[in-house]
Amino acid sequence: FSDGMLFTAVWEREGKMAGTPKEEIKRIADQFAFTGELVSCGPCGSGHINETYMLRYRIGEMGSIKVILQKINREIFQKPEELMENIAGVTGHLKKKVLQKGGDPEREVLNLIPTKDGKAFLTDENGECWRAYIFITDAVSYDLAEKPEDFYESAVAFGKFQEMLADYPAETLHETIKDFHDTKKRFQTLKNAIEKD
């Protein structure tokens, strides 16, 4: 298959990708500041909250870039503008920290792709919200730990994340899911569910 044929073949085989028709994905993608020509698209990942798509754009004769396009679940995130304000603020802060330490913010931090009018996300005519990130190539993620070392590496990464955010102005963050970080309340909810089961 050529890239164009692959793009068409995937859509014809699947008909719909994770619930959103192909024409809609193309139309939404066209509203972001992506570089290049869209040549392929398909569902991405194993998540259960947002609709996630992997898009590949051809840049020039030989190069290409992959991006992630996500439709934010409005049932879970009822104030997506606050969610995206949090993400933009935190990722901006992390990029500065990574640069200060001589790291590579393109690989170590999520990079939002703005809409063509410079916003962090898009609200379509149906009130659905979409965001886009540069895909980090050669990165690995796990749904389940495969060995004890995976737990260790997860803890190291989480510790590094917390360290870099130690001086972030937490008072500027919005609570995007009520009581999500209330450990006592979450634990009580778990206990109640266990008792009912």
What label would you give each PLM region?
Residues M17-V39:
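Juxta-kinase regulatory segment immediately upstream of eukaryotic protein kinase catalytic domains
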